């Protein structure tokens, strides 16, 4: 199974918080874990924000960042190409998504087209984004883009 993770799920791999165990299980069950290249900057920003807000100590931030840096090359990363960003723009309008969420959804769609919707799962903490991914999966299946 190929698992696509957005940044909210990716962060849960490096910071223990509610839902981390679920994401760890999904990742351990996946043959491939994919994400957008934009998740790198988003994850680093999220870790820094958690430190600023006091949710992470300095040493926990250092450990999380080091582990993330070591594991980043293991992810299948999708580039935010012009065509992918244009598709993301369409998805943002269709599903009322924020910009980076729509990039994650467009990246997931690309992964699902390559691996097949039957063999691809989407993971996010964001309910709206999860619902959009479910609707998009049904559309891809219905139109034969699986």
Regions found by a protein language model. Give the residues of each.
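Short, well-structured N-terminal submotif of metal-dependent ribonuclease cores
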Residues: 1-39, 50-63, 138, 144
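Acidic, PIN/NYN-like endoribonuclease modules and their adjacent C-terminal/linker elements
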Residues: 2, 106, 110-146
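Short beta-strand scaffold positions
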Residues: 5, 35, 79, 99-102, ...
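Amphipathic alpha-helical segments within well-ordered protein domains
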Residues: 8, 48, 89-92, 109
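Anionic, Ser/Thr-rich low-complexity intrinsically disordered regions
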Residues: 25, 35, 58-63, 67-78, ...
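Short active-site oxyanion
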Residues: 30-33, 74-76, 116-121
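Acidic catalytic patch
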Residues: 40, 72-95, 102-107
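Short glycine/serine- and small hydrophobic-enriched flexible loop segments
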Residues: 45-52, 109-113
């Amino acid at each position: 199974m190929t698992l696509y993770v957005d940044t909210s799920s990716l962060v849960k791999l490096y910071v223990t918080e509610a839902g981390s165990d679920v994401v760890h299980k999904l990742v351990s069950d996946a043959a491939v874990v994919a994400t957008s290249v934009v998740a790198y900057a988003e994850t680093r920003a999220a870790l820094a924000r958690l430190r600023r807000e006091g949710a992470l100590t300095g040493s926990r931030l250092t450990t999380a960042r080091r582990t993330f840096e070591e594991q980043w090359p293991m992810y299948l990363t999708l580039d935010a190409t012009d065509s992918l960003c244009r598709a993301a723009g369409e998805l943002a309008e269709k599903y009322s998504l924020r910009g980076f969420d729509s990039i994650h959804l467009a990246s997931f769609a690309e992964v699902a087209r390559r691996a097949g919707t039957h063999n691809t799962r989407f993971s996010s903490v964001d309910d709206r984004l999860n619902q959009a991914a479910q609707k998009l999966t049904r559309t891809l299946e219905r139109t034969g883009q699986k």
